[in-house]
């Protein structure tokens, strides 16, 4: 992507993805930004242009989440949406709920406006006693902000948060590279 500026932010201790995002506030400024976790691997980023464009069709959108239908939701934040065109409208999110109310897993790429920082500052610690982005998005929804959802469909991606998952992603990449 042309004119793309990437900033890396490290945490001294695990205080949550929301805390890491809050630490980036001074770099973001007043423009929308793409947020990508460090523990997810997408072998094909061809969806990204459409994902970015989808967040720009309505100036009232505060954020766009990426979701995928999943049978097993353990370890995922979930979204509940209302069907709309061109994107679904989010009306509820929850971070790793014990009893999910939908099968829409939130994937770890977001497009957000700086309003998220105010929401993070108003959000209490959540799952694992950490500040969570999903909880801040819930705060935005409570404040009547508009959040949309982009369906990732059946595209492949890997959670690489553990050694075993990272190995599977490397193995998959190796197979692609040696075809």
What are these regions (language model features)?
Residues 24, 39, 79, 113, ...:
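Residue-level signal for inorganic ion chemistry
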Residues 1-76, 121-122:
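Conserved beta-loop-beta/alpha segment of the NTase-like Rossmann-fold superfamily
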Residues 68-71, 80-84, 100:
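Short, conserved, surface-exposed binding loops centered on an aromatic residue
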Residues 52, 56, 84-178:
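Catalytic-core segments of class I nucleotidyltransferases/pyrophosphorylases
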């Amino acid at each position: 992507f042309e004119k793309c500026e990437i900033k890396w932010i490290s945490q001294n201790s695990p205080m949550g993805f929301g805390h890491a995002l809050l630490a980036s506030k001074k770099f973001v400024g007043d423009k929308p930004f793409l947020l990508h976790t460090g523990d997810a691997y997408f072998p094909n980023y061809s969806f990204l242009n459409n994902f970015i464009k989808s967040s720009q069709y309505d100036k009232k959108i505060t954020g766009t989440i990426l979701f995928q239908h999943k049978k097993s939701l353990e370890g995922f934040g979930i979204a509940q949406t209302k069907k709309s065109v061109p994107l679904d409208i989010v009306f509820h999110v929850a971070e790793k709920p014990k009893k999910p109310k939908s099968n829409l897993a939130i994937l770890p790429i977001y497009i957000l406006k700086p309003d998220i920082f105010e929401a993070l500052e108003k959000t209490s610690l959540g799952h694992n006693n950490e500040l969570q982005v999903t909880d801040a998005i819930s705060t935005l929804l409570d404040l009547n902000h508009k959040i949309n959802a982009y369906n990732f469909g059946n595209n492949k991606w890997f959670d690489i948060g553990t050694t075993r998952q990272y190995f599977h992603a490397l193995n998959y990449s190796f197979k692609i590279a040696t075809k």
